Regions:
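Residues immediately flanking
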Residues: 17, 65, 103-104, 110
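Cross-kingdom TIR/SEFIR domain
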Residues: 79, 91-94, 110
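Catalytic NTP-binding/metal-coordinating core of nucleotidyl cyclase/transferase enzymes
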Residues: 1-74, 81
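Short amphipathic alpha-helical interaction patches enriched in hydrophobic/aromatic residues
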Residues: 21-24, 86, 107
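Active-site phosphate-binding and catalytic loops of NTP-dependent enzymes
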Residues: 83-91
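A short glycine-enriched loop-to-beta-strand structural element that forms part of the catalytic core
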Residues: 93-107
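Single conserved hydrophobic/aromatic residue that forms the stacking wall/gate
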Residues: 108-116
Length: 116
């Protein structure tokens, strides 16, 4: 058995709603509607800055980017879009997001015998 190790630099952005559970307790339908609106804004930013979602969990989104610059610019643009959305008089539920960005080396292992 020959195990090969491949490495790849990854830049990950994590977006998470502040106080999501409390919003859901107050008004589940309005919160879900608000989250869907915010998710559209995020997807627009991701497309513009070449990010792609690779995992979601509840109110959290994890996206990978080709560079740290792209991830930071996306995070800033998304926060600006959320601010504009929340300032609208039509907005029932005003959601806030925390954004985290990390860059590091991923290790991939593959068993060469399994690939034949």
């Amino acid at each position: 058995m020959n195990t090969e190790v491949d490495r790849k630099i990854a830049v990950i952005l994590v977006a998470d709603v502040v106080g999501y559970s409390k919003h859901m307790e107050r008004d589940e339908n309005a919160t879900l509607k608000a989250y869907a609106e915010c998710e559209k804004l995020l997807k627009t930013c991701l497309k513009k800055y070449k990010g792609s979602i690779f995992n979601t969990a509840g109110d959290s989104v994890l996206a990978e980017f080709p560079s740290a610059v792209n991830a930071v610019e996306c995070g800033v643009a998304f926060q600006n879009d959320i601010k504009k959305r929340n300032e609208s008089d039509k907005t029932e539920v005003k959601l806030e997001f925390r954004i985290g960005i990390n860059m590091g080396c991923l290790l991939y292992t593959s068993d060469a015998a399994d690939e034949s």
